[in-house]
Amino acid sequence: MTFAALSLLFAMTSADAVAVLLNSPGASSVRTFEVARETVEREAAKGKPLQQFVIGVTTDDKALAKKYMDSSRERIRFLAAHKDNPLAWYLLSLESNDLKLLRRAAAGNNVQALNALGTLVIREAFDKKNGVSTNDLEVILKKSFDCFSRAAAQRDPNGFINLGTCYLRGFGCEQDLAMAFECFKSAAEAGHPEGMDNVSACYQFGHGVAPDAELSLFWGMRGRAARGDEAAAKWLRERK
């Protein structure tokens, strides 16, 4: 492990690591995701139920998933049923693919549930677009916008990406390119590679911000470096 990765490991809290792992690899840099997984795996191996269940729903190792989920399921169910823990509701919704549990988690402001529910609603809206009136479509899209707004209000990178996309396209709100740019920039500054790409595109095409070829290149390189592109990382180091 490099010194930089070691520093990141000590800086990352358990809650941060769980959030990174549940937000999927594309929502953070390759290094951040790897460190988050190592952090959660280490705590799961110590017998911590929450971390065990998180590994269970995110690993490709079916045997390990069964072992950890069988070991921790009772505790997660207790946290959901008796503590009304939003993260516990979300984890149970992942295991059973249960929309009711997902809504319960979103009602408790779990950011992963808010993003998932908002995305699900918006997809269904467009799947049914031909059979939905314009007014009904606007109401449906507003529900997605509200979900993403609540996630972004908690400084969640995926929430910023989703909210920025709503502003960019006018989904559930008036189109506002300046707000879209600010959302994408917030995601980028939080380390989201897609946010970096979007900021680069905004500077390239002048969406919500004055065109700037140099800044477009800079953010594009940051997005590539975050995904593990060594040439881009070298370019950024030499630019300092």
Describe each model-derived feature in a short phrase.
Residues 44, 106, 117, 152, ...:
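Fold-core signature of tandem repeat domains
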Residues 43, 78-79, 104-105, 150-151, ...:
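Canonical positions in the second alpha-helix
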Residues 18-22, 37, 49-53, 86-90, ...:
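Alpha-helical tetratricopeptide repeat
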Residues 32-34, 61-74, 94-101, 127-147, ...:
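Structural signature of tandem alpha-helical TPR/SEL1-like repeats
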Residues 217-240:
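Terminal, low-structured helical/coil segments at or just beyond the last alpha-helical repeat
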Residues 54-61, 91-96, 116-130, 162-169, ...:
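Hydrophobic face of amphipathic alpha-helices that form TPR/SEL1-like repeat modules
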Residues 8-67:
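N-terminal leader/linker segments that initiate helical-solenoid repeat arrays
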